Amino acid sequence: MSRSRASGRPRSRRRECEFTKLGIVPDYKDVKRLQKYLTAQGKILPRRRTGVSAKMQRRLAVAIKRARHLALLPVAPSHTR
C-alpha cells in the first residue's frame, strides 16, 4: 500500500459507486435506498461521504427531490419536544 508524503499514513482505497456496481439508476420510488443518502435532518449527503460518482450523485439528488415532492420522503424531519 502506498503512503502519502504529507502525513505518512496509508492512503485509503477509493470506494466504488454502489449504483454503478449494482448496475442500477437511483429511482424516486426506492425510498429505502434513498434514505441511506440523507442525514437525520433530511439533507442530502455529499459525494465524499457516500462514495457515489458525480453522475449518480446528480441523479440521486433529482430522485430525492422527486420523492420529497410526492411526499414519499419528508422535506423536513418531524421535530419532537
UniProtKB/Swiss-Prot annotation:
Pfam families: Ribosomal_S18. One of its GO terms (molecular function) is small ribosomal subunit rRNA binding. Keywords: Ribonucleoprotein, Ribosomal protein, RNA-binding, rRNA-binding. GO terms for biological process: translation. The keyword Ribosomal protein applies. Belongs to the bacterial ribosomal protein bS18 family. Binds as a heterodimer with protein bS6 to the central domain of the 16S rRNA, where it helps stabilize the platform of the 30S subunit. Part of the 30S ribosomal subunit. Forms a tight heterodimer with protein bS6. This is Small ribosomal subunit protein bS18. The gene is rpsR.
